[in-house]
């Protein structure tokens, strides 16, 4: 079973999935909508769950370096509450601090228009990699 990483945005939401072994993550897609609508994003997630056999969802949580919440933090927390009502899977937060900065650095050579279309799925990949490397692997070692 695979993991799904999400970089949630009001307009653009990036998705990434793990490979079958949960060792690496791959950018999947960027979902674009005209305004923030949880239902549209949840429908997109349900499609991904059916297609890729997902067993865990990881959402990037934007927290300032001093652990202070922002409007974006509250938006993401509210989304998780809505998602939990619709989907019966474990859902984790991963601090996404700097994921967009790292994503932009990794695609720095691309033209700005193309970069805008993929930065969110690269951010989702970074979020999912963080989970796989720091949480999921630790959990596996703790079981043995």
Swiss-Prot record:
Q: Which Gene3D superfamilies match?
A: YqgF/RNase H-like domain (3.30.420.140)
The primary site where this protein sits is cytoplasm
TM ranges: none
Record's keyword terms, sorted: Cytoplasm, Hydrolase, Nuclease, Ribosome biogenesis
Give GO BP annotations, semicolon-separated: rRNA 5'-end processing
Xref: SUPFAM superfamilies: Ribonuclease H-like (SSF53098)
Say yes or no: keyword Nuclease present. Answer: yes
Give the EC class as a word.
Answer: hydrolase
The cellular location(s) given in this protein's UniProt record come to:
Cytoplasm
Which is an annotated GO molecular function term of this record?
Answer: nuclease activity
Instruction: Tell me the InterPro entries matching this sequence.
Output: RNaseH-like_sf, YqgF, YqgF/RNaseH-like_dom, YqgF/RNaseH-like_dom_sf
| Family assignment from sequence similarity | Belongs to the YqgF nuclease family.
Protein's job: Could be a nuclease involved in processing of the 5'-end of pre-16S rRNA.
What is the protein's given name?
A: Putative pre-16S rRNA nuclease
Q: Where does this protein come from, organism-wise?
A: Mycoplasma mobile (strain ATCC 43663 / 163K / NCTC 11711) (Mesomycoplasma mobile)
């Amino acid at each position: 079973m695979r993991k799904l990483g999400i970089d949630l945005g009001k307009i653009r939401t990036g998705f990434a999935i793990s490979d079958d072994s949960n060792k690496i993550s791959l950018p999947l897609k960027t979902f674009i909508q005209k305004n923030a609508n949880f239902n549209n994003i949840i429908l997109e997630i349900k499609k991904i769950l059916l297609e890729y056999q997902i067993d865990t969802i990881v959402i990037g949580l934007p927290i300032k370096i001093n652990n202070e919440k922002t409007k974006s933090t509250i938006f993401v927390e509210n989304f998780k509450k809505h998602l939990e009502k619709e989907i019966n899977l474990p859902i984790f937060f991963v601090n996404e601090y700097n994921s967009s900065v790292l994503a932009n650095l990794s695609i720095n050579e691309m033209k700005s228009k193309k970069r805008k279309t993929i930065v969110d799925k690269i951010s989702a990949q970074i979020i999912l990699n963080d989970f796989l490397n720091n949480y999921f692997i630790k959990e596996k070692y703790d079981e043995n």
